[in-house]
């Protein structure tokens, strides 16, 4: 029987390096994907993921299984990503979002679009829609963006997201409501054409 994340982390706390390797292999890709959606830069997302795992490892002795491991890990990731976004805004105010999405490096990111052997045209339309949705999500205020990404892409429940964002569940629901309303406004042309569902 496979060990739970909590069991693995308790083993890491006890000095088991292989358990840490298992956690790293299990969560590296989802963590990098989440961080990419937050910071919109593959290299920065990779660096932040390494920093998250480094912080998890350094804090192993303080780990207490009072919350799910993923809640703890994504809280660290969210804080690092928000700090990175804030720092980046101050350094690169003149770079537009369009310029950052046109680099070859960013073209390598995974898209959450189902593959049912679509035609080239369907694939292009699907990529365009996904890009429009991600641009709209990226334009949200930081906390709203984090809440939407944790809810829709990481599929965390309200309680977990509230812990990650350090707010009450009712405050989170209000935050998500405002975020989805903002997305509806931003994506209205796509929604009105039945192109996308928010």
Residue ranges, per PLM feature:
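Short, charged helix-capping/linker segments at alpha-helix termini
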Residues: 13-22, 32-51, 169, 191-198
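C-terminal edge and immediately downstream basic/flexible tail or linker adjoining helix-turn-helix-like DNA-binding
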Residues: 11, 40, 93-99, 111, ...
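Sigma70-family region 2
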Residues: 13-14, 40-41, 53-68, 87-88
């Amino acid at each position: 029987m496979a060990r739970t994340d909590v069991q693995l982390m308790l083993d890491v706390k006890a000095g088991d390096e292989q358990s840490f390797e298992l956690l790293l292999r299990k969560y590296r890709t989802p963590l990098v994907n989440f961080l990419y959606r937050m910071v919109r830069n593959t290299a920065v997302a990779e660096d932040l993921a390494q920093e998250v795992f480094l912080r998890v490892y350094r804090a192993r002795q303080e780990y207490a299984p009072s919350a799910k491991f993923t809640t703890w890990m994504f809280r660290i990731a969210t804080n690092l990503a928000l700090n990175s976004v804030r720092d980046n805004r101050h350094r690169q105010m003149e770079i537009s979002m369009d310029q950052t999405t046109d680099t070859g490096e960013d073209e390598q990111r995974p898209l959450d679009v189902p593959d049912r052997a679509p035609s080239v045209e369907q694939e292009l339309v699907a990529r365009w829609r996904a890009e429009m949705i991600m641009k709209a999500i990226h334009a949200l205020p930081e906390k709203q963006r984090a809440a939407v990404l944790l809810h829709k892409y990481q599929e965390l429940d309200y309680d977990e997201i509230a812990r990650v964002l350090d707010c009450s569940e009712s405050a989170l629901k209000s935050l998500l409501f405002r975020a989805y309303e903002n997305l509806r406004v931003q994506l209205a042309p796509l929604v009105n054409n039945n192109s996308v569902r928010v």
